[in-house]
């Protein structure tokens, strides 16, 4: 049975959880402002967290509570990712059209709209809310508890995060957050110079490409004539090379958190190993499992400290473009406001009327609502720095998204999620 609470009471509970997260992030902001945590140290701590502490958190939470039945149920998450990405893309395009932005500015607003934070802030809030909010246990799981709720929330976020990260560093890095060269007005001098250096070579490259095409046609003709003499060993070599290429591409997209999730799935699939690690009060449980759990407990505070330190203004001043305010407004509305107008009703109706897979899990509803309104990903700062792409605008967007809007928006949205849960399950 779902216990009913007033909106004011729910808002107060959410406020407590969000404020806890904000206070830890403020510690990181203070550390950066006092010089205790300079940029280089932030990068080292962030790397240590991603490669060590976060994988331990993922393994300790998932391997303990996962089962094969749950693993099959999460197939809906890529569908949810596609839906949210599509609507966010449309939202970014709408804002760009309203604000009359050019191609590069439009790509920037679209990138900020599409690539929301699914790592630091949502993970911290989900863990905090899992132990604070009422009615988050799932009636389909016998003896469900808050530890299991937190574990499932992390699992949903992790899958969303991994898909988003691959998209950010492919489509985002190579297309959306890179100068097209169509309008050099906004481009920094170094990028303009690079564009000018590339331009004279275009005609030569076309001539070279034509010669290469002719050569390739001749080679193809020769290959056809000699195809009957192709040995089985050469076919085997080609298959082996193809397999190695595919394996390398897969390995390039793997990272420590993803490895950790894979190991957690393996442990969950082997019942005796899972019991020995987490349920039997034996040597392995009291040593290895406890050590991993303690390492994982460091992850969330470190994530928030680094998040807070990243929000401290850099000593380096980047020039603002002519449409600085337009880009700021378009990115914030396109990321945190406009998509929620479409997505939140869709999620609410799906939870009410489609009792399929994890749609019935209360923590999935909370995670879905949080992801819909989460600020732009901190990782976008790295991409804009690498491509020298609207760096001043990116810094201001992150400040407004995290320091100003995250607290009130999170309170309203999570309180709304619990209200939707009460509406969807009145008895």
Curated annotation (Swiss-Prot):
Pfam families: Mem_trans (PF03547). The keyword Nuclease does not apply. InterPro entries: Mem_transp_PIN-like. It comes from the Eukaryota. The chain crosses the membrane at residues 10-30, 43-63, 71-91, 253-273, 288-308, 327-347, 358-378, 397-417. The modification Phosphothreonine is found at residue 199. One of its GO terms (biological process) is transmembrane transport. The modification Phosphoserine is found at residue 234. Its main location: membrane. It is found in: Membrane. It is a multi-pass membrane protein. GO terms for cellular component: endoplasmic reticulum; membrane. Keywords: Membrane, Phosphoprotein, Transmembrane, Transmembrane helix, Transport. The keyword Transmembrane applies. PANTHER family: AUXIN EFFLUX TRANSPORTER FAMILY PROTEIN (EUROFUNG). Belongs to the auxin efflux carrier (TC 2.A.69) family. Present with 6440 molecules/cell in log phase SD medium. This is Uncharacterized transporter YBR287W.
């Amino acid at each position: 049975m779902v216990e009913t609470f007033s909106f004011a009471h729910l808002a107060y509970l959410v406020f407590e959880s969000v404020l806890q997260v904000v206070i830890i992030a403020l510690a990181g902001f203070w550390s950066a402002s006092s010089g205790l945590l300079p940029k280089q140290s932030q990068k080292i701590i962030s790397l240590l967290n991603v490669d060590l502490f976060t994988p331990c958190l993922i393994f300790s939470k998932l391997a303990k509570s996962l089962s094969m039945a749950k693993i099959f149920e999460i197939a809906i998450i890529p569908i949810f990712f596609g839906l949210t990405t599509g609507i966010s893309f449309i939202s970014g395009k709408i804002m760009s059209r309203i604000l009359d932005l050019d191609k590069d500015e439009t790509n920037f607003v679209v990138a900020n709209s599409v690539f929301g934070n699914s790592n630091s802030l949502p993970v911290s809030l989900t863990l905090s809310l899992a132990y604070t909010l009422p009615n988050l246990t799932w009636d389909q799981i016998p003896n469900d508890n808050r530890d299991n709720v937190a574990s499932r929330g992390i699992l949903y976020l992790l899958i969303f995060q991994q898909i988003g990260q691959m998209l950010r560093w492919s489509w985002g890095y190579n297309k959306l957050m890179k100068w097209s060269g169509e309008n050099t007005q906004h481009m920094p001098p170094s990028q303009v110079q690079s564009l000018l250096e590339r331009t004279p070579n275009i005609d030569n490259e076309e001539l070279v490409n034509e010669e290469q095409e002719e050569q390739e046609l001749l080679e193809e003709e020769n290959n056809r004539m000699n195809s009957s003499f192709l040995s089985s060993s050469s076919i085997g070599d080609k298959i082996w090379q193809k397999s190695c290429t595919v394996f390398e591409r897969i390995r390039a997209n793997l990272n420590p958190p993803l490895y950790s999730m894979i190991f957690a799935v393996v442990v969950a699939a082997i019942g005796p190993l899972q019991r020995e690690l987490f349920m039997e009060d034996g040597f392995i449980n009291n040593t290895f499992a406890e050590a991993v759990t303690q390492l994982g407990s460091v992850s969330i505070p470190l994530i928030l400290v680094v998040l807070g330190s990243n929000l401290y203004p850099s000593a380096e001043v980047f020039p603002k473009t002519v449409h600085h305010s337009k880009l700021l407004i378009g990115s914030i509305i396109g990321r945190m406001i406009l998509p929620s107008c479409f997505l939140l009703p869709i999620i609410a109706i799906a939870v009410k009327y489609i009792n399929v897979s994890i749609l019935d899990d209360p923590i999935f509803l909370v995670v879905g609502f949080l992801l819909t309104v989460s600020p732009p990903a901190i990782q976008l700062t790295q991409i804009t720095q690498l491509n020298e792409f609207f760096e001043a605008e990116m810094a201001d967007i992150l400040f407004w998204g995290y320091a100003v809007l995250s607290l009130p928006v999170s309170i309203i949205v999570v309180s709304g999620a619990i209200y939707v849960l009460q509406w969807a399950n009145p008895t």
